[in-house]
Amino acid sequence: MKWSILLLVGCAAAIDVPRQPYAPTGSGKKRLTFNETVVKRAISPSAISVEWISTSEDGDYVYQDQDGSLKIQSIVTNNTQTLVPADKVPEDAYSYWIHPNLSSVLWATNYTKQYRHSYFADYFIQDVQSMNLRPLAPDQSGDIQYAQWSPTGDAIAFVRGNDVFVWTNASTSQITNDGGPDLFNGVPDWIYEEEILGDRFALWFSPDGAYLAFLRFNETGVPTFTVPYYMDNEEIAPPYPRELELRYPKVSQTNPTVELNLLELRTGERTPVPIDAFDAKELIIGEVAWLTEKHDVVAVKAFNRVQDRQKVVAVDVASLRTKTINERDGTDGWLDNLLSMAYIGPIGESKEEYYIDISDQSGWAHLWLFPVAGGEPIALTKGEWEVTAILSIDKPRQLVYFLSTKHHSTERHLYSVSWKTMEITPLVDDTVPAVWSASFSSQGGYYILSYRGPDVPYQDLYAINSTAPLRTITSNAAVLDGLKEYTLPNITYFELALPSGETLNVMQRLPVKFSSKKKYPVLFTPYGGPGAQEVSKAWQALDFKAYIASDPELEYITWTVDNRGTGYKGRAFRCQVTSRLGELEAADQVFAAQQAAKLPYVDADHIAIWGWSYGGYLTGKVIETDSGAFSLGVQTAPVSDWRFYDSMYTERYMKTLESNAAGYNASAIRKVAGYKNVRGGVLIQHGTGDDNVHFQNAAALVDTLVGAGVTPEKLQVQWFTDSDHGIRYHGGNVFLYRQLSKRLYEEKKRKEKGEAHQWSKKSVL
């Protein structure tokens, strides 16, 4: 069947934006304080997230009211009925999932956090007629890792002790019995949760509920990293710290192996399915998706170890035969795991079935239709812009709703594209700078349109094919009123042109009561990691950056610069950092600082840089350049040597240590001259309980600096006992920002040739 690749742009009327195309500056006189921005945010917009449900009427959803009760509401009529009264909600309820026919509720209680996404809990099933509760497992003790209704509601798959179980009204069946510290069934291990799946589950029901696909991870041979907890949530420290033994593969170390399993629920038969796309020791499974309306085909997106080759392997469930239906070579950089595969079915008059996915095979991330049986894909979108998310697939109307950077890489506008006509239609006025998102009802007839900035966010309800809102869901009127009392920093956006001709997105925040006749210190606030984005026209929280631009004793300008390697500007822009992390990113931040220093309102002698995580690493690489462009560096929870970080993230960008030894050496922070010469010194902050970027990074860096003779005048170090990567344990977060405020104040007041202790004037042998 022949398809035209001509992509039409629809001319239908789009929704107007009842907000200003820039961030608010307030209309009052009050300045934001530290307590209002860091300790407890005084002004913060809210938004609702609804769980759409399938009933006889489109537009119904379930939500938990402020009193704790569960209610069903028609978003169209606003009629509400109570599903579970507040006094019948289980004590200590953490989350809930509704049975497909609304007859029961699955509750999670007794929550205990594990890693970024995962947690342990008890689970209860509540009948909404009788309100009776029964435990999912009679002997549960806050140890269930995950639970999920089947699409038909006649079963619950859950994971306990790293084993998969299936509950039905009649009984509970244990599907696997080899789960343990090194074997994970149906849930990811640490590295798959953190770097690949980005979630706490690794099991998927078929659309008809007849089969369950799940992944099995084997950590045998994966090296262990020990994280000590000195206080361990006690008021008085125990004599010996608790030690977390975490299987954490670092660069070129053994990775967990992964295996696909299929379970037929009717018979209880479980079958391992070999995925031979790559050698078992090299194989990474990034995504599992059912490409069928029933249970005929399940597909896995497989990557090689360094994630620059990809194969989509389809499994015929009846025969268990496998077939590679799509393959990519991304050895010019890396291939992102976007978790966006979804079944479409036949299109047009053809009986051939398709699935949709986001791919940057054209050099820009776009929507493509791929044949389930394999073959040439069809481009649904194209151009020098990128699709950032698929929001909804409306099969009856043959439409895909998506977000993209079509207007600018710092913006997100909402569009639909028809796979029948190939016509792209904006749902909002995409000529107005903004960031949008949307949530579509179960039958696709309505959607909540969320405006996310740069002005104060709001949410309206729309019917499809209408540009008039049915009603406002969230107005954030209190925020609008609150801003009338304050005067806020002024946020602007612009681009810097590199000598290469490429451009960098910049977000500038000017202090309250800014005067072009004064000179202000500047704080750069980069993240800068591969594929990331900080410069966005979304609402900018009134946080620490707003505070330092408001406090009359600080009055810092802030610059946030998205360097080369960051996201949403095409594959070539992001992939040029491959195998040499830290080089181009640091060069771009230095270039931006040099441009800032030329501005008449910038105090060129006081330009600081502060970053967290990858931003902390980038800050170190900037200081290492010894450029003189920056006068102070603050590194929070930084990587200092990529050999210390996990394999699946690091090797995606740096490849293996064996193949790129020179690149790893160059990317590590080891040159000390910049640390000795930076005029205002460096502050390094890190949590000792960081299970992501280990404290080892800061410890090794500090030892390198001290051993090379960096003086106490130039180096300050702060650890946070038992804090993880977010640094919040026992008030660590507030302390961190107070310390940062103090250093910025000292830097602003620092004289270029001040008095110093005699130790700093001579070498110490």
Curated annotation (Swiss-Prot):
It comes from the Eukaryota. GO terms for molecular function: aminopeptidase activity; dipeptidyl-peptidase activity; serine-type peptidase activity. Residues 1-14 form the signal peptide. It is found in: Secreted. GO terms for biological process: proteolysis. Glycans are attached at N35, N78, N101, N110, N169, N218, N465, N490, N665. This is Probable dipeptidyl peptidase 4. The gene is dpp4.
